[in-house]
Amino acid sequence: MFNQNSPIISVEQLNKEIANHRILHRISFSVYPGEIVGIIGHSGSGKSTLLRCLDFLIEPTSGSISIAGFHTSSPIEKISRTAFAKRVAYVSQSCGLFLAKTVFENIAYPLKIRCPEMTKALIEEKVDDVLHFFNLYERKHAYPSRLSGGQKQKVAIAIAIVSDPRVLLCDEITSALDPRSTEDVVDKLSQLNEERGITQVFVSHEIEIVKKLCCQTLVMHQGSIEESGPTEQLFLNPQSAITEELFHMQSIAKGIYEHGENEEILRLGFPKGLAVQGMISQLIQSGGISINILSGDIHLFRKTPLGFLIVALSGGKEQRDWAKSSLREKGVIVKQFQKSR
């Protein structure tokens, strides 16, 4: 059992170069037991390379990685893959199933390889357990060719977790799935975290999934961490233009309204229960400003609803500054969008 107060993953000043080309640069972060951490970024930003470093598939040029008790202080080729795979599991979008084996045989295979002392009865018990968890028990004797894309991906995750790992690394595992299958897989990943306490690192370009699943998120750009923090804070108050672009917020505001000289476009973020509409009414009644609500929505972050409004704030500069300050004092996250050029 790992100490809940100590990181189960610790990365310090990680660098990776291939043929004198910098892939990763000074990457540092920690993941604590039970967290689901997302990694987002444009194609080529280094997300998958970082995940492969965490899985000890490639050795960093410099820096250190500690994951589930394994450390890069030892050359990775000297680390037992069998022992490593019992604690750290890796799933990619390709699934990697044996086509000539049934669903049951695919899931049982790693147990037979990694745990030769395990009895046939115990193997069957563990495989049946994950089959029931993923609602695949009725498909246990089916071959991969008879499965849907979503079912194949769930089998791949079942293979990864049947050995009871402490960490699950997921690389774009929903990218080839239809929306219904994606939702099913994401729900199972969340359930794995809640019921079995499996720490997860989730690489994805699908922002809605990251918002739903991940408590913390790393934003990568050109091999470096551009920004990191609680996922909802990155969404509500991004500090980086890259983060803002990935969450599509600047384009949303520009597409809604082109503001005038004495107007500002604001994005107001607020948790459930904060009566932001009443606050806006009070500000308008105070005089000197007008607030036009342009759009609004509710987003779920790990089942916690957070809302936002995009508004046009009009009035003199002093009155606008007072209105923004008043909203912030009441707990509203205020994000100002730059005027289009």
Swiss-Prot record:
Alphabetized PANTHER family for the sequence? AMINO ACID IMPORT ATP-BINDING PROTEIN (PTHR43166), METHIONINE IMPORT ATP-BINDING PROTEIN METN (PTHR43166:SF30)
In this chain the ABC transporter domain maps to 9-247
Enzyme Commission code(s) on record: 7.4.2.11
Residues the record lists as binding ATP:
41-48
> Does this entry carry the keyword Secreted?
no
The name of this protein is: Methionine import ATP-binding protein MetN
Q: Which reaction does it catalyse?
A: L-methionine(out) + ATP + H2O = L-methionine(in) + ADP + phosphate + H(+); D-methionine(out) + ATP + H2O = D-methionine(in) + ADP + phosphate + H(+)
Name of encoding gene: metN
**Main location (coarse class):** membrane
Report keywords, A-Z: Amino-acid transport, ATP-binding, Cell inner membrane, Cell membrane, Membrane, Nucleotide-binding, Translocase, Transport
- What Pfam family is a match for this entry? ABC_tran
Gene Ontology cellular component annotations, sorted alphabetically: plasma membrane
Q: What class of enzyme is it?
A: translocase
Enumerate the subcellular locations listed in this protein's record, separating them with semicolons: Cell inner membrane
SUPFAM superfamilies for this protein = ACT-like, P-loop containing nucleoside triphosphate hydrolases
Kindly give the SMART domains that the UniProt entry links to this protein: AAA (SM00382), NIL (SM00930)
Q: What does this protein do?
A: Part of the ABC transporter complex MetNIQ involved in methionine import. Responsible for energy coupling to the transport system.
List the GO molecular function terms.
ABC-type D-methionine transporter activity; ATP binding; ATP hydrolysis activity
Q: How does it sit in the membrane?
A: Peripheral membrane protein
Q: Does the keyword Secreted apply?
A: no
**Subunit record text:** The complex is composed of two ATP-binding proteins (MetN), two transmembrane proteins (MetI) and a solute-binding protein (MetQ).
Tell me which family the UniProt entry assigns to this protein: Belongs to the ABC transporter superfamily. Methionine importer (TC 3.A.1.24) family.
Q: Which residues form a coiled coil?
A: none
